[in-house]
Amino acid sequence: MRSLIPFAATEPKTRLAPVLDPDERAAFARVMLSSVVETVIAAGLEPTVLATAPITDPLPAAASIVVDDQPLTAAVNEQLAADSPMLVVMADLPLLRAADIHDLVATDADLTIAPGLGGGTNAFCTREPAFRVDYHGASYLDHRAA
């Protein structure tokens, strides 16, 4: 199963602008990305980081990087169209555990979603080739309805 980690490499975590400057937000985002990559590897998968710009920080050798300057929704949908089944895990989940990933991929369901507290989508596993994402607003509800 392919595993994809979308990562906004330019201007990450803008909602934290009131408390962190741009360099601090970028460093914070990179640390979380690294944690998620390591967790996906610990779950036995080889992650592909889908980044909006080149990443200069080293990642574990088992991770590959694809750079796509499209908005993340379009970039993820392009990847989904190319391959199925696929696990997609957001890059800002520092509490993610390998067991969480195992739970997502263990089912035979066409779509398994891990919702975020604010109505977003933290991760999903899809076996449905026609599934597409929409990461705006309450994406969890949009993805459930798809």
Model-derived regions: residue spans:
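Hydrophobic targeting segments
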Residues: R2-P6, L33, P47-T48
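A short, N-terminal amphipathic alpha-helix
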Residues: A29-E46
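Short, glycine-/small-residue-rich phosphate/pyrophosphate-handling segment
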Residues: F124-A146
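Acidic donor-binding segment of Leloir-type glycosyltransferases
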Residues: L45-S64
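Short phosphate-binding loop-to-helix
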Residues: P60-L87
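Active-site acidic Asp-centered loop
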Residues: V89-A91
